[in-house]
C-alpha cells in the first residue's frame, strides 16, 4: 500500500505532508445537476416554491460548503480560498450547477469545487422536495483544474 499517498504501510489513513510543496495559483471547476419536472423548474426559476427563493439560498450554501470542505472531508487540507462562485443554468428537466474555486496554496481545490456543487444541489433538493419528492441529483464531476504538479486539464 505504500504507493497510496493517504495510507500508511499498516493500512491506516493519514493526512499527507504538504509542507515542502510550493504555493501556486490553483483553480477547479465542477458541475452537477438537479433533475426535476418542468413545472418545478418554472417554480425554481420564478422563486415560487413553498420554502422560498431557492437559488440565492443554494448559492450561499454552496459557497459555505466549499469553505467547510476540510471539516467534512477528513483528509482535505484547509486552504485559504480566494474566490468561490456558484452559478445556475436553467434546463428543461432541471438545473445545472457550476462552481469555481480559486486559491493560492500547496494543494488543489477540486474537493472544494465538488463540495460547493453538491451542497448547492442538496439545498435545491431540500427546497423543491415539497413539490417533487422524486427529484434526482446527478452528474457531479470536476470539469477542469489548473495549477500544481499534475498541471492543467479539462474535460
UniProtKB/Swiss-Prot annotation:
CDD domains: MoaC_PE. GO terms for molecular function: cyclic pyranopterin monophosphate synthase activity. The active site is at residue 126. Pathway: Cofactor biosynthesis; molybdopterin biosynthesis. Keywords: Lyase, Molybdenum cofactor biosynthesis. The keyword Lyase applies. InterPro entries: MoaC, MoaC_bact/euk, MoaC_sf, MoCo_biosynth_MoaA/MoaC, Mopterin_CF_biosynth-C_dom. It catalyses: (8S)-3',8-cyclo-7,8-dihydroguanosine 5'-triphosphate = cyclic pyranopterin phosphate + diphosphate. The keyword Lyase applies. Catalyzes the conversion of (8S)-3',8-cyclo-7,8-dihydroguanosine 5'-triphosphate to cyclic pyranopterin monophosphate (cPMP). This is Cyclic pyranopterin monophosphate synthase. It comes from Corynebacterium efficiens (strain DSM 44549 / YS-314 / AJ 12310 / JCM 11189 / NBRC 100395).
Amino acid at each position: 500500500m505504500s504507493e497510496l499517498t493517504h495510507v500508511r504501510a499498516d493500512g491506516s489513513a493519514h493526512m499527507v505532508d504538504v509542507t515542502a510543496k510550493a504555493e501556486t495559483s490553483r483553480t477547479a471547476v465542477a458541475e452537477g445537476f438537479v433533475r426535476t419536472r418542468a413545472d418545478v423548474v418554472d417554480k425554481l426559476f420564478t422563486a415560487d416554491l413553498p420554502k422560498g427563493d431557492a437559488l440565492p439560498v443554494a448559492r450561499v450554501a454552496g459557497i459555505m460548503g466549499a469553505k467547510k470542505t476540510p471539516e467534512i472531508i477528513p483528509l482535505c487540507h484547509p486552504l485559504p480560498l480566494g474566490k468561490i462562485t456558484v452559478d445556475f443554468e436553467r434546463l428543461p428537466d432541471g438545473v445545472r450547477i457550476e462552481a469555481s474555486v480559486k486559491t493560492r496554496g500547496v494543494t488543489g481545490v477540486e474537493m472544494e469545487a465538488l463540495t460547493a456543487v453538491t451542497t448547492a444541489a442538496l439545498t435545491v433538493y431540500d427546497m423543491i422536495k415539497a413539490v417533487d419528492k422524486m427529484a434526482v441529483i446527478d452528474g457531479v464531476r470536476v470539469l477542469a483544474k489548473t495549477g500544481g504538479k499534475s498541471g492543467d486539464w479539462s474535460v
